[in-house]
């Protein structure tokens, strides 16, 4: 395995060298024309003719955007090319360490900051793996002036416990409007503890067409997620107090509750959004990138004309010399013959024709110069202008198709681990006794039709207005048992949803923006569901920098998922009717760039809160009598959140802090740490003016609380319901040190995570009974190519 890693690293380095040393590059101009250039930017000439001596700058423009999932609106976005905190982007615990996980990287996770948690999805089994998921509204679409490739790779450990992650993106345009590409992600974590390996793979293909009247976005994705479930270690003392145990274990020898238990989630997704715009044209100034692209195209056209003219001249010369047919050189005429005569009479004088009164008469050289200067000025302006289509009305259609399949598979189960057993074998008559093979499927097709009156087509239209109607069909499959049998079959269930809604928004300009959206369930299982969202921001100059004030509010009445009310497996089952969950949220944000300060305050009230719970008895050999399910709290729960982000700089010394305070009114149902802290202290400087270096350390800390445990049978974090076995975590700092580098289009880092392992209380748990990895050396590298 080490040889394979070395081979992969050498291959990547070789690819980089080849990219830098290649003699010929293919480039695409703004009109989609492909031409070649050498490494100096000169036009590539296979005949080695010196057709031009001017080095032309090749444009490397890449524009990125996301789209609204409902309407397909384009929203500008930034490519992930920032070197800062690159070393933290590889963790499933988040850039700021704000997520709990089950120890190993790439495992399930849950955000400790409640207001940042995403709402549950219809197929909630994949929610804890959201870091592997790129939803249509989060996917980056590209428009490129030249083919764009991005490759990232990070690694740690060896063939027994290591981790590997590779991410590859590619984008290319066929002309100005049509773009396409792919995005691949592969995660593989073997695990530093027993029975902890996991692997995830995602492949996405996209295509875009962004024309004046017609726009289209297509995204097709396939996912494979596999996680080995170990149920946690059998005794926390192996980590916190090893001296109390008669047997001493190394990290990879500590016994775990489960073995040969797996969660598999496969899914396929198609997203297609398109619209037809009705509007008019106007002239606007081009961006710097577009000006460079036009100049590049003009230089390419001029270069082509010169080559063709030179080729034509050489061809005529060869014809005149008779070289094409090896003919002798003919003697050409040398002047007028001696006997030449002038024929005819000399032409007579003609009458003057009347002047054209429609033409502008230039009386003097000064007037001529003035006209020429005015024309040159207008030509200069026209060279930087382009025609822009201004849409007034849009007709919108969006198709969203999703197909999920989940299997919980266990070859063995510990004695007395489960409290209940509801069937023996699966639908194929296998996995009887201690085996488990639970299967679940979900398929949905959603069509949305919208009509939009767009913002900004004239000075009076300060906001955009949209309306829509959507219809969704859903199909489910899950185990069910016939009376008198011990074998399950996959029962089928169907439901439909008809929703209507609208949106009023202002997104243009720099000072003031707002968005108001509402959606109502009319018929079907989502009848009565309501979502009202509002956000706004105000930006203005204060003491030489931008001050931003923002507010956000929403009211959501959400119906429970099908699997929240109906679920059957070999050892867990519930059949219940839940009320709609209601959430009311108000949030304010203050951000001032000059002092690098950001303050966020939020208040949220929840009613009929839906959550997962589990219970078991703790023994010396692990856990027994496990039960779990979906629960609902009918009372009101209030959550107060205050978060401060404050950065400081003194010369090359930088200090960043994120401090979050939370208070839940019902800690039994919604436990949250009172304080969550992330701090990052580092030196930032350049070597030889080209190599950017960040050298420092960061730490994550949160106060003790009864964090949710993990229920592997449904892949969810669940509240600890048994008072006798409840376990607190927290009060322990996680410290990393790193060196982060950025050289031109390459980022790379080397880091040591959890350098303080083995010190202090040794309570390095992010989930009860699931210890995190100890000290691990990691490295990563990221390249961007524009050819």
Residues of each region from the PLM?
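Sec/Tat signal peptide C-region and signal peptidase I cleavage site
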Residues: 18-22
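Exposed, low-structure sequence patches enriched in small/polar residues
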Residues: 220, 254-312, 356, 365-787
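Membrane-proximal, glycine/serine-rich, low-complexity loop/turn segments characteristic
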Residues: 23-271, 275-362, 541-546, 744, ...
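N-terminal secretory signal peptides that target proteins for export/translocation
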Residues: 1-5
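Sec-dependent N-terminal signal peptides
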Residues: 6-16
């Amino acid at each position: 395995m080490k040889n394979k890693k070395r081979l992969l690293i050498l291959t990547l380095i070789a690819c980089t060298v080849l990219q830098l040393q290649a003699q010929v590059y293919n480039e695409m101009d703004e009109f989609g024309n492909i031409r070649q250039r050498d490494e100096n930017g000169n036009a590539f000439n296979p005949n080695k003719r010196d057709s031009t001596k001017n080095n032309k700058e090749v444009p490397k423009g890449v524009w990125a955007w996301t789209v609204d999932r409902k309407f397909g609106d384009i929203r500008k976005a930034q490519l992930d090319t920032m070197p800062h905190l690159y070393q933290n982007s590889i963790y499933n615990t988040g850039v700021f360490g704000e997520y709990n996980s089950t120890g190993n990287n790439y495992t399930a996770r849950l955000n400790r900051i409640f207001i940042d948690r995403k709402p549950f999805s219809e197929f909630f089994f994949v929610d804890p793996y959201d870091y592997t998921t790129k939803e249509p509204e989060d996917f980056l679409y590209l428009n490129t002036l030249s083919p764009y490739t991005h490759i990232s790779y990070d690694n740690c450990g060896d063939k027994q416990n290591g981790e590997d992650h590779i991410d590859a993106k590619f984008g290319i345009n066929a002309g100005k409007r049509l773009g396409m590409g792919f995005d691949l992600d592969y995660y593989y974590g073997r695990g530093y503890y027993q029975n902890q390996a996991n692997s995830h793979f995602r492949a996405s293909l996209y295509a875009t067409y962004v024309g004046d009247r017609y726009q289209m976005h297509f995204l097709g994705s396939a996912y494979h997620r596999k996680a080995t479930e170990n149920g946690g270690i059998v005794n926390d003392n192996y980590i916190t107090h090893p001296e109390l145990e008669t047997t001493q274990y190394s990290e990879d020898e500590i016994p775990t509750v489960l073995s040969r238990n797996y969660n598999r989630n496969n899914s396929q997704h198609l997203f297609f959004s398109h619209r037809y715009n009705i509007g008019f044209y106007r002239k606007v100034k081009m961006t710097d990138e577009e000006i460079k692209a036009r100049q590049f195209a003009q230089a390419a056209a001029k270069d082509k004309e010169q080559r063709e003219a030179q080729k034509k001249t050489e061809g005529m010369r060869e014809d005149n010399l008779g070289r094409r047919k090896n003919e002798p050189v003919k003697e050409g005429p040398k002047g007028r013959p001696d006997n030449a005569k002038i024929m005819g009479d000399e032409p007579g004088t003609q009458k003057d024709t009347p002047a054209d009164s429609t033409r502008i008469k230039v009386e003097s050289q000064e007037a001529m110069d003035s006209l020429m200067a005015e024309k040159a000025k207008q030509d200069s302006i026209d060279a930087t202008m382009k025609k822009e289509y201004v849409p007034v009305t849009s007709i919108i259609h969006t198709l969203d198709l999703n197909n999920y399949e989940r299997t919980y598979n266990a070859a063995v189960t510990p004695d007395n681990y489960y409290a209940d057993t509801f069937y023996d074998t699966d639908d194929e008559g296998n996995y009887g006794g201690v085996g488990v093979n639970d299967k679940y499927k979900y398929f949905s097709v959603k069509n949305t039709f919208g009509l939009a009156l767009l913002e900004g087509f004239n000075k009076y239209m300060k906001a955009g207005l949209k309306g829509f109607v959507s219809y969704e069909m859903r199909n489910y499959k899950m185990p069910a048992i016939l009376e008198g049998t011990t074998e399950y079959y996959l029962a089928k269930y169907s439901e439909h949803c008809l929703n209507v809604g609208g949106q009023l928004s202002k997104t243009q300009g720099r000072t003031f923006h707002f968005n108001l959206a509402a959606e109502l369930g009319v018929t079907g299982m989502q009848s009565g569901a309501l979502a009202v969202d509002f956000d706004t921001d105000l930006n203005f100059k204060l003491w030489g920098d931008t001050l931003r004030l923002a507010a956000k509010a929403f009211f959501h009445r959400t119906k429970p998922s099908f699997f929240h009310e109906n679920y059957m497996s070999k050892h867990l089952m519930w059949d219940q009717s839940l009320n709609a969950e209601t959430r009311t949220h108000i949030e304010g944000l203050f951000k001032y760039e000059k002092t690098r300060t950001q303050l966020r305050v939020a208040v949220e009230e929840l009613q009929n809160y839906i959550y997962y719970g589990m219970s078991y008895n703790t023994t010396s050999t692990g856990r027994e009598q496990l039960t779990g399910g979906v629960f609902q709290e009918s009372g009101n729960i209030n959550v107060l959140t205050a978060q401060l982000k404050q950065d400081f700089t003194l010369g090359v010394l930088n200090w960043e802090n994120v401090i979050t305070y939370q208070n839940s009114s019902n800690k039994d149902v919604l436990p949250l740490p009172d304080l969550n802290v992330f701090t990052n202290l580092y030196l930032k400087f350049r070597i030889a003016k080209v190599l950017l270096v960040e050298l420092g350390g960061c730490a994550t800390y949160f106060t003790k609380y009864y964090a949710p445990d993990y229920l592997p049978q449904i892949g969810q974090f669940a509240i600890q319901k048994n008072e006798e076995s409840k376990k607190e975590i927290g009060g322990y700092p996680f410290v990393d040190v790193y060196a982060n580098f950025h050289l031109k289009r390459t980022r790379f880092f080397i880091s040591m995570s959890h350098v303080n392992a083995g010190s202090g209380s040794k309570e390095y748990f992010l989930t009860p009974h699931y210890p995190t990895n100890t000290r691990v050396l990691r490295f990563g590298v990221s390249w961007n190519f524009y050819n």
